[in-house]
Regions:
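Surface-exposed loop/turn motifs at beta-strand-loop junctions within extracellular Ig-like
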Residues: 10-12, 68-70, 95
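A short, solvent-exposed beta-strand micro-motif common in secreted/extracellular proteins
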Residues: 21, 45, 59-69, 128
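Extracellular beta-sheet/turn segments enriched in Thr/Pro/Gly and aliphatic residues
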Residues: 79-99
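A short, solvent-exposed loop/turn motif at the edges and junctions
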Residues: 50-52, 66-78
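Short, ordered, surface-exposed loop/turn motifs in non-cytosolic proteins
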Residues: 12-37
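A short, amphipathic beta-strand motif
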Residues: 2-11, 21-23, 62, 91
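Short, surface-exposed beta-strand/beta-hairpin micro-motifs centered on an aromatic residue
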Residues: 43-46, 50-57
Length: 186
């Protein structure tokens, strides 16, 4: 096995930055650090990263995708890992727009963590930083009596994970079991 160590940072400031990371090994399998928080649910798998990661991959081709919010260019790279190699990667993310400087602030007001979610509190803590959201709203939802992980949170602002730059709120979706086909969100 080869070990990949990645350092993610803002290309302009040089500051470490949080991002989501997708790594595929030579067999086409998703790889993540053993202790990482994973995105659970449909779509491309990724792990949340607060700036540095380390993981092992078998020898062969490795594809890496690093993404942060909507204002940064995705960083894609491919490399070849030889057995027992130690690969140190510097992963600079380039910002293509600075919308907050124009008084536009990114956010997501419609997030669910489904019944398969294993670390909802860690994920809600990381979500605004990895996506660079100023506002994050996680929705409570009742559908087919599934135990949505997001339903474990109390309604209102989550002061324990909100910061001066990232507000995390728990809202309730206005569609439930009785008429789920007629809902319009929060």
């Amino acid at each position: 096995m080869a070990t990949i160590r990645g350092t993610i940072f803002d290309a302009t400031s040089g500051s470490p930055t949080a991002a989501k990371v997708h790594v595929l090994d030579s067999t086409g399998h998703f790889r993540a650090p053993a202790d990482s928080v994973l995105k659970i649910g449909p779509g491309r798998p990724f792990f949340y990263c607060e700036g540095n990661f380390e993981l092992d991959v078998p020898r062969g081709a490795v594809d890496i995708l690093v993404e942060r919010g909507t204002e940064y260019e995705p960083l894609k790279l491919s490399l070849s890992a030889s057995p027992q190699a130690n690969i140190d990667l510097e992963l600079p993310l380039k910002r293509w727009a600075d919308l907050p400087s124009q008084q536009w602030f990114p956010g997501n007001t419609h997030i669910h963590y489904d019944e398969k979610e294993q670390q909802p509190h860690e994920r809600v803590r990381l979500e605004p930083h990895v996506h660079d959201f100023s506002v994050t709203v996680v929705s409570i939802l009742q559908r087919n009596d599934l135990p949505y992980a997001s339903n474990r949170f109390p309604l209102g602002v989550m002061n324990d994970v909100s910061t001066a730059h990232h507000v995390v709120d728990i809202g309730e979706e206005n569609r439930h079991n009785a008429s789920s086909h007629m809902g319009y969100g929060h």
